[in-house]
Amino acid sequence: MAQTMLLTANAKVDLRSKESLVERLKPKPLSSFFLPSLPLKYPSASASASSHFTSTTVALFKSKAKAPAKKVVPKPKEKVEDGIFGTSGGIGFTKQNELFVGRVAMIGFAASLLGEAITGKGILAQLNLETGIPIYEAEPLLLFFILFNLLGAIGALEDRGKFIDDPAPPTGLDKAVIPPGKGFKSALGLSEGGPLFEFTKANELFVGRLAQLGIAFSIIGEIITGKGALAQLNFETGVPINEIEPLLLFNIVFFFVAAINPGTGKFVTDEEEE
């Protein structure tokens, strides 16, 4: 009987040791490492408490979110335009084309004034005298010529490009003295190899527009009155032509020189600026 009780006791001890070993081998929750284990009377309650316990992780330092990179939108480049119609090509003349037309108009207007001073006939009568073509047969061409000059004079045919003046020469007292090896033009502030009158191409363009207006209105006036430009001037002002001969000669010479004189500056188009 005593042996049986001893074996039973030993068996109980072994069972307890086995149970404690099984308990040790069971996976424990993470909270058991950070929180002290509390002795609970009922293991089922501790298991349920550990199953309901949740741990929240709070980050002390958060990585700063990067701001999205700004997209740089290239600014659209403005076109070099100066015309009334703004056609950007099409029927639009460049300023260089209009400059050529203005030079032709200056030569034509000066020649018509000189011819009227010699022959006493207007530009249309001179055309009839030189070619023998009656004016009424050339009316369509004449109307086109008048319209073309009027539109060109107000800048309606050109819209592309611009003239850029050359940089101004330096000024000062040191520039008032003629430097060694330089001529008299450099003392006046003029470029040695440049034109004498220092006309810019923009100035020449303006004078060409005036010549276009002069030709157009002299033709219109001659169609209406039958008189040339000088006779119209005499009719409007009452001043005899012989009294304004110096002014007339100056205008003729001025238009001729302005037409053949190369202006300073340069012509820039849209493609060259890009």
UniProtKB/Swiss-Prot annotation:
Membrane topology: Multi-pass membrane protein
Pfam families reported for this sequence: Chloroa_b-bind
InterPro entries: Chloroa_b-bind (IPR022796)
TM regions (residue ranges): 104-124, 138-158, 205-225, 240-260
Gene3D superfamilies found in the cross-reference section: Chlorophyll a/b binding protein domain
GO cellular component, one term: chloroplast thylakoid membrane
Top-level lineage group: Eukaryota
Keywords: Chloroplast, Membrane, Photosynthesis, Photosystem II, Plastid, Repeat, Thylakoid, Transit peptide, Transmembrane, Transmembrane helix
Intervals holding Sequence repeats: 61-166, 167-274
Subcellular location: Plastid, Chloroplast thylakoid membrane
Function per UniProt: Seems to be involved in non-photochemical quenching, a process maintains the balance between dissipation and utilization of light energy to minimize generation of oxidizing molecules, thereby protecting the plant against photo-oxidative damage.
Name under which the protein is recorded: Photosystem II 22 kDa protein, chloroplastic
Species per Swiss-Prot/TrEMBL record: Nicotiana tabacum (Common tobacco)
Gene encoding the protein: PSBS
